[in-house]
Amino acid sequence: MKHEIKAQERNFNWIRSGRKTFEITRANKEYRPGDEILFREWSDIMNSYTGRTEERIISYIYSGGGQYGLAPGYIILALLKKPEAGKC
């Protein structure tokens, strides 16, 4: 399944560079390991999407249920770079 997430410019750049390998988000969708995430860069200055996108695959989902500082109703998605087409 594919999901779309709006990413602020700074977070988008960290995801694109590989420095950010997780996403904390509300548990309001049916996320599953193996699902694809399409991050769409959002500019607060322009108040619109920039047109830049980045794809990742969910490798693991942590739902702490209020433990370890994670608020109830939130999850952490571990992200992997999506392999390029034709490459293994």
Language-model regions, residue ranges each:
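Catalytic phosphate/metal-binding cores of nucleic-acid and nucleotide-processing enzymes, i.e., regions
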Residues: 1-88
